[in-house]
Amino acid sequence: MELFPEKRILTVSQLTSLIRGVLEENFEHVWVEGEVSNLAMPASGHLYFTLKDAGAQIRCVMFRASARALKFRPRDGMGLIVRGRITVYEQRGDYQFLVEYLEPRGVGALQLAFIQLKEKLAKEGLFAEEHKRPIPSLPQRIGVVTSATGAAIHDILNVLNRRFANVEVLIRPVKVQGEGAADEIAEAIIDFNRYGAVDVMIVGRGGGSLEDLWAFNEEKVARAVHRSRIPIISAVGHEIDFTIADFVADLRAPTPSAAAELVVKSKEELASKVEFLRHRLIQTLRRILADAGGELESLSRALRDPTVLLGHLSQRLDDIFVRLERAIAGDLKDRGRMLEALKNHLRLRNPALKVERARERVIALSDKSEIALLRHVDRYREAAAVHSARLETLSPLGTLARGYSVALKLPERVPVKTFRQLALKDRLELLFHHGRAWCRVESLDEDASCSHE
């Protein structure tokens, strides 16, 4: 009998392989909850991190194909729920958790991705009001980006036809959910800006779950909406649904039907607005006519009493003469003071030569002063004559003196400006430069150029 039974001796590789088989067979689909730490994402695209709790930790790896499908970005300190399997990395003798799927703890992955992208774009200013373009009040051509087979396009067309059938609609059919939907929506927005020549766009779809609406939460769609030169109305889902596209768009409509109602006014609304503007125009014209009538009445009152106008003109002429007299008197005083100063200067300096020269200067200055004074007087007289002639020309009495007359319609004594104020048998008072006469209208003739022989 052998003291020691036969021993089975394993190599390190064999032992590691056995351990790997046991772990991978028994831990093939496992859900694990923990907190992320040591997160790394190298150029390879793989995701490396440690999942830990208060008592232990495990290394995790998520290969690039799975990592690219993530809707959100994990961060250190974030709580995760992961699904995967245990594998052994034989070269180091380590075991690790190969993650196939993960989601944030306490909130869905899509909801977290929505929050993260919303915060990112808000910081970049994509939601700012200064970027919002005004929606045209009466567009001629409307572009629609939605599914060609969904209920949304039928709702939009029905509303547009009911409210304003003359508007032209260009439809760009796209996928609105599933793989590639975001790419098609963004491309359609870009194409409308490049070729569509539309006045406004409606981008949207009918209701659905968060997953169904997710294409409108993609960053590429948000940036296409932001870069659009054409105003965009976002109409995704129902009234309670909000997407990233809603925040970036120039206007958010709760439903596709509401978007159609916002983009065009009904014929009744337009007719009501036209009637409102017509009423305002009539009021404005009436106010202008009333103001003009008041001014005309003021002028008419002034013409009825020409003595008032003559009185004002006479006062102006009196003021001119008073200023003229003061100017002449002041100039004479100045010249007199100058002569007196020269005399005093001569008295102080008595040599005969200086006296003679001073006398000659005094005579010369006196002559110049007299000439200048006469010139001033002549200019003031000429100015007074000109003003007097102008006043005479402006005077209604002067007009009468030149052979004209003024016709007043009796009994109101209203000045007659046109024959249309007259009727047969009307009594008139004619004012002449000297005297007045009364007459009666026997006939009327519209042609002012005709003469009676």
From Swiss-Prot:
InterPro entries assigned to the protein according to its UniProt record, in alphabetical order: Exonuc_VII_L (IPR003753), Exonuc_VII_lsu_C (IPR020579), OB-fold_nuc-bd_dom (IPR025824)
One Gene Ontology term from the biological process aspect of the record: DNA catabolic process
Pfam families: Exonuc_VII_L (PF02601), tRNA_anti_2 (PF13742)
CDD domains: ExoVII_LU_OBF
Enzyme class: hydrolase
UniProt KW keywords: Cytoplasm, Exonuclease, Hydrolase, Nuclease
Subcellular location: Cytoplasm
Reactions catalysed: Exonucleolytic cleavage in either 5'- to 3'- or 3'- to 5'-direction to yield nucleoside 5'-phosphates
EC number, UniProt record: 3.1.11.6
Segments forming a coiled coil: none
GO cellular component: cytoplasm; exodeoxyribonuclease VII complex
Single Gene Ontology MF annotation: exodeoxyribonuclease VII activity
Subunit structure: Heterooligomer composed of large and small subunits.
Homology family: Belongs to the XseA family.
NCBIfam families cross-referenced by the UniProt entry: xseA
HAMAP family, per the entry: Exonuc_7_L
Job description of the protein: Bidirectionally degrades single-stranded DNA into large acid-insoluble oligonucleotides, which are then degraded further into small acid-soluble oligonucleotides.
Record protein name field: Exodeoxyribonuclease 7 large subunit
Organism from which the protein derives: Geobacter metallireducens (strain ATCC 53774 / DSM 7210 / GS-15)
Origin organism lineage: Bacteria, Pseudomonadati, Thermodesulfobacteriota, Desulfuromonadia, Geobacterales
